Amino acid sequence: MEWQTRFSPLNLSTQDALPELSISLLDNLGMITMVGDDKKSYLHGQVTCDVVSLEKDQSMLGAHCDAKGKVWSVFRLFHHNDGYAMVQPKSAIEVELKEIKKYAVFSKVTIEESSDIVLGVAGENADAFISTLNADSGEVRTVEGGTAVKVASNRWLLALTAEAAQSLLEDSQATLTTHELWTRFDIEAALPYVAADAQNEHIPQALNVQALGGISFTKGCYTGQETVARAKYRGTNKRAMYIVKGATAEALGEGAIELERSVGENWRSVGALLTHYQFSDNQAMGLIVLPNNLDDDTRLRLVTQPECEWEIAALPYSLDDE
């Protein structure tokens, strides 16, 4: 679509001010939608969050697991059109769609990948901008061609038809940028990002889903519940997701970015970043799952750039269950 060429990368240093209003084309994200008479009961029985309690003007995070409690997807759930929408990394959807539909034949529900465009609106003028589309006070609002969803202070997702997205941008004075800026905001908020290469690797608590209100321990049965409950009540989970940051000698590539941690005089692999953001002044940040007993001052380094040491940064929330 020609209008999408208006979005361009925004190269920012660690010292640069952020735009007062930016709209990011989130082509790295997609949506699974669910409609039908049984949508609520079916989804409630598949995921970690309390779907039944979700109000029309709210969104929530949740996870979908396999029978062993390993995560297929972490998503943001909200009411959209006549059903639900689950926003998540686009690369995860092929597998997640197959898994979430596995038992749907027994229910009156239609589950499919949405063709809607996902945009991210951010900046100190974001709330005012959304209010021009719908002046209601809710954190989820119906707008022309779709839905607006508040995800944080001064940050909104827009799920729109292509026609509505194009119309919205025709006279916009916002900075139009690609998805990397939104990724930065998600990293700073420590919001889990489970792309295809991280599926079926971690339980929800290792991705901090419980700390973000994405696990209900009172809702009843769902796929993988036994493992998730055991991690809480028996303390079997030994991992958590952290923000890490440090210097780069050269730009980080798009492939797996592996880190090592210091162990005495040696270095030991700790895994790959779930996602990352590259600043223009040779600094970067990312999210990674690490052992949850590491000291805050544990030394880390990039495997491919061993001269570049990284550190663990503070999370913006407690890891306790909410």
From Swiss-Prot:
Keywords: Cytoplasm, Folate-binding, tRNA processing. InterPro entries: GcvT/YgfZ_C, tRNA-modifying_YgfZ, YgfZ/GcvT, YgfZ/GcvT_CS, YgfZ_barrel. It holds the Pfam family YgfZ_barrel. It is found in: Cytoplasm. One of its GO terms (cellular component) is cytoplasm. Belongs to the tRNA-modifying YgfZ family. This is tRNA-modifying protein YgfZ. It comes from Vibrio campbellii (strain ATCC BAA-1116). The lineage of its organism: Bacteria, Pseudomonadati, Pseudomonadota, Gammaproteobacteria, Vibrionales.
